[in-house]
Curated annotation (Swiss-Prot):
Keyword Zinc included in the entry's annotation: no
Keywords of the record: Cell cycle, Cell division, Chaperone, Cytoplasm, Isomerase, Rotamase
Function per UniProt: Involved in protein export. Acts as a chaperone by maintaining the newly synthesized protein in an open conformation. Functions as a peptidyl-prolyl cis-trans isomerase.
GO biological process, one term: protein unfolding
Lineage: Bacteria, Pseudomonadati, Pseudomonadota, Gammaproteobacteria, Alteromonadales
Protein name listed in UniProt: Trigger factor
Pfam family, one: FKBP_C
Family: Belongs to the FKBP-type PPIase family. Tig subfamily.
TM regions (residue ranges): none
InterPro entries for this protein: PPIase_dom_sf (IPR046357), PPIase_FKBP_dom (IPR001179), Trig_fac (IPR005215), Trigger_fac_C (IPR008880), Trigger_fac_C_sf (IPR037041), Trigger_fac_ribosome-bd_bac (IPR008881), Trigger_fac_ribosome-bd_sf (IPR036611), Trigger_fact/SurA_dom_sf (IPR027304)
Domain PPIase FKBP-type: from-to ranges: 161-246
PROSITE patterns listed in its UniProt record: FKBP_PPIASE (PS50059)
Domain comment, as recorded: Consists of 3 domains; the N-terminus binds the ribosome, the middle domain has PPIase activity, while the C-terminus has intrinsic chaperone activity on its own.
Reactions mediated catalytically: [protein]-peptidylproline (omega=180) = [protein]-peptidylproline (omega=0)
Length: 435
């Protein structure tokens, strides 16, 4: 076997392998003789079919079979001999061959990049810091009251925080567009659920009024055909309701699982949840900033095949999210280009974090794994049952170990990098998570 390796472009390699004629013909002839003994052919006794007949009838198929197996086998040997680290499946191309000639094929594929990290000490990272204050807790209680509010119809002009019921029909350049019409639609004014300007255009109008609103779809709107377009909505306002908040009584408190009905117990439970959510949000924020700094400070080539695989994953996740909120028939087109930048970043992060782990010989901290499992379980009614489920599920334990090792790598980078803490409010941190 003769092997040569050529670097074609970026991480792409072209491997050319030549197999001696004797080796190919030996394998080919062996298959022919085997078929001559086992293949049933009309006009010949079993086991007495001439090899010339087998070659004439089945030669092309035998050639394909032998070529395929020899390419796979010799490619694997060549890759090991040349110490190539494949990032994706190869594309084989056999060359034409006459009997008695050597058999040559090429295999084109991408390899993993060689990663050299810049010093972690050179990274500059701003790390958010926040805490849950009494004001944050009071605001959360107020949010709970709003979630359980009643709505009473009023005979006045609509204002922010009112709930309105309306019919609307949108048109662009005088033409009604698909998905731009609804009847009996409820919206709380000021909630920001509609495109900018829509809710504000309803403020000041009373039930029974009909009017138009001129607004523009945002440039980043999910429907490609509507991005940045000017639209006019014809509105018929049928109802205006004001919000009536419930009093904080023992009965109200008991709605949230607090059996004793005491407000202080409810506040204690809510604060625990807020602290846990804030802690996770701060951890995620720090991780994002570490990974961004890591990518920005390290040039790295990445295999196109891995980016394409990641795009498939991201697109599938996006479609699943849309499917929960929209009619399947109205799901938007999601071209690969939408996910390319995010996919490239995720692939780069994988290589760079992997190198941090390898170079610094980081290993899974089982105490951290246990802490992560306990944290995940604490959100359930029966934490012990959830913990046991993790421990008895090999795949879930492996996933949690991967998460732990990744967090260890992030913590290691934070220890080495230049870190500046930035004080923020609970809302600033959590609203960023929602956004």
């Amino acid at each position: 076997m003769q092997v040569s390796v050529e670097s074609t472009q970026g991480l792409e390699r072209k491997l050319t392998v030549t197999i001696a004629a004797e080796a190919f013909d030996k394998e080919y002839n062996s298959r022919v003789h085997h078929l001559a003994k086992t293949q049933r052919v009309d006009g010949f006794r079993p086991g007495k079919v001439p090899t010339s007949v087998v070659t004439k009838r089945f030669g092309a198929g035998i050639f394909q079979e032998v070529a395929g197996e020899l390419m796979q086998r010799n490619f694997s040997e060549a890759v090991m001999a040349e110490k190539l680290n494949l990032a994706a499946r190869p594309n084989f191309e056999p060359q034409a061959r006459e009997k008695g000639q050597d058999f040559t094929f090429t295999a084109t594929f991408e390899v993993y990049p060689e990663v050299t990290l810049s010093p972690l000490e050179a990274l500059s990272i701003e790390k958010d810091s926040a805490e849950v204050t009494d004001a944050d807790l009071d605001k959360m209680i107020e949010t709970l009251r709003k979630q359980h509010a009643e709505w009473n119809a009023v005979e006045r002009e609509a204002a922010n925080d009112d709930q309105v019921t309306l019919d609307f029909e949108g048109s662009i350049d005088g033409e009604v567009f698909e998905g731009g019409k609804a009847e009996g639609f409820d919206i709380v004014l000021g909630s920001g659920k509609m495109i900018p300007g829509f809710e504000a255009g309803i403020v000041g109008h009373a039930a029974g009024s009909e009017f138009t609103i001129d607004v523009n779809f945002p440039e980043d709107y999910h429907a490609e055909q509507l991005k940045g377009k000017a639209v006019q909505f014809a509105i018929k306002l049928t109802k205006v309701e004001e919000q009536i908040l419930p009093e904080i009584t023992p009965e109200f408190v008991q709605k949230f699982g607090v059996e004793n009905g005491e407000l202080e117990t409810l506040k204690h439970d809510i604060k625990q949840n807020m602290v846990r959510e804030l802690s996770q949000a701060l951890k995620n924020s720090a991780k994002d900033k570490v990974l961004n700094a890591l990518v920005e400070n390290n040039e790295i080539e990445i295999p196109k095949a891995l980016v394409e695989d990641e795009i498939v994953v991201l697109r599938k996740q996006a479609m699943e999210r849309y499917a929960k909120e929209m009619d399947p028939e109205n799901l938007p087109e999601l071209p690969a280009e939408l996910f390319k930048e995010q996919a490239e970043k995720r692939v780069k992060v994988g290589f760079l974090l992997g190198e941090v782990i390898n170079v610094n010989e980081l290993t899974v901290d089982q105490e951290k794994v246990a802490a992560l499992i306990e944290s995940a379980a604490s959100a359930y009614d029966n934490p012990a049952e959830v913990i046991a489920y993790y421990k008895n599920n090999k795949e879930m334990m492996q996933n949690m170990e991967n998460v732990a090792l990744e967090e260890q790598a992030v913590d290691f980078i934070i220890e080495k990098a230049k870190v500046t803490e930035v004080n923020k409010s609970f809302d600033e941190v959590m609203n960023k998570v929602v956004a």
